[in-house]
Amino acid sequence: FLPVVAGLAAKVLPSIICAVTKKC
């Protein structure tokens, strides 16, 4: 379960950071 969540977070976090900070 945790590795799946970690993998998902690794995919989603950059796009969230990109959207929030406008740094891509």
Swiss-Prot record:
One example of a Gene Ontology biological process annotation: defense response to bacterium
Transmembrane domains' residue ranges: none
Principal localisation: secreted
Alphabetic keyword roster: Amphibian defense peptide, Antibiotic, Antimicrobial, Disulfide bond, Secreted
Disulfide bonding pattern of the chain: C18-C24
Tissue expression remark: Expressed by the skin glands.
Repressor keyword on record: no
GO cellular component: extracellular region
Location in the cell: Secreted
Role: Antibacterial activity against Gram-positive bacterium S.aureus and Gram-negative bacterium E.coli.
Family: Belongs to the frog skin active peptide (FSAP) family. Brevinin subfamily.
Protein name (database record): Brevinin-1SY
Taxonomic placement: Eukaryota, Metazoa, Chordata, Craniata, Vertebrata
